[in-house]
């Protein structure tokens, strides 16, 4: 029972870290990467479809993304979707290929992005702590039902606290790396 609670807690904490990494990947730095456009959708015959399902997204160079549309009639829609996204990108259409240059980040924009990342990091820390709280509540329930002793509960709580510390430290490390990446010119 205790091991199940620990395994569930660790699994949920790991998923929180993965979600945080995914969120960090969306935050634009000065460099281009193909995953930057993954969350942008385009109207494809009446349904919202991610860009990577209607085109090849590749890197042309460190500061330019190339989008090779599979159907010529989709080029204008894809270009508009990229332009209208919240990323502040200005795509240029060249037939079937759309070039998306990455504008240099201003100091002010870097600070704003750092604040956004800091907020996301705090949300991830809170999520990890909520998993700890839920696991500790499950342990208290087992103790109330006399399924475990107080010593077992205390040991399990200590183990869960160690897991929490480990995953909060991981969030802090990821945040520090992203902050350094954002502030690098």
From Swiss-Prot:
GO biological processes: cytoplasmic translational termination
Pfam families attached to this UniProt entry: RRF
GO cellular component terms attached to this protein's record: cytosol
Keyword Cytoplasm belongs to the record: yes
SUPFAM superfamilies noted in UniProt: Ribosome recycling factor, RRF (SSF55194)
Chief location of this protein within or outside the cell: cytoplasm
Localization annotation: Cytoplasm
Keyword field contains Protein biosynthesis: yes
UniProt keyword list: Cytoplasm, Protein biosynthesis
Molecular function GO labels: ribosomal large subunit binding
HAMAP family: RRF
Family, as annotated: Belongs to the RRF family.
Function: Responsible for the release of ribosomes from messenger RNA at the termination of protein biosynthesis. May increase the efficiency of translation by recycling ribosomes from one round of translation to another.
Name of the protein this chain belongs to: Ribosome-recycling factor
Species, as recorded: Laribacter hongkongensis (strain HLHK9)
Gene label: frr
């Amino acid at each position: 029972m205790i091991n199940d609670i620990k395994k569930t807690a660790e699994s949920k904490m790991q998923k929180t870290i993965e979600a945080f990494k995914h969120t960090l990947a969306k935050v634009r730095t000065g460099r281009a990467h193909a995953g930057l456009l993954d969350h942008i959708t385009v109207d494809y015959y009446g349904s919202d479809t991610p860009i990577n399902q209607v085109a090849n997204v590749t890197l042309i160079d460190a500061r330019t993304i190339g989008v090779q549309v599979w159907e010529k009639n989709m080029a204008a829609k894809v270009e508009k979707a990229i332009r209208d996204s919240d990323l502040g990108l200005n795509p240029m259409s060249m037939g079937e290929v759309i070039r998306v240059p990455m504008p240099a980040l201003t100091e002010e924009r870097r600070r704003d992005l750092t604040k956004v990342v800091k907020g996301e990091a705090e949300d991830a820390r809170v999520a990890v702590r909520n998993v700890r709280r839920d696991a500790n509540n499950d342990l208290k329930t087992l103790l109330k039902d006399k399924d475990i002793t107080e010593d077992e509960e205390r040991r399990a709580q200590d183990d869960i606290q160690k897991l929490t510390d480990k995953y909060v430290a991981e969030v802090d490390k990821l945040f520090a790396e992203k902050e350094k990446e954002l502030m690098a010119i």
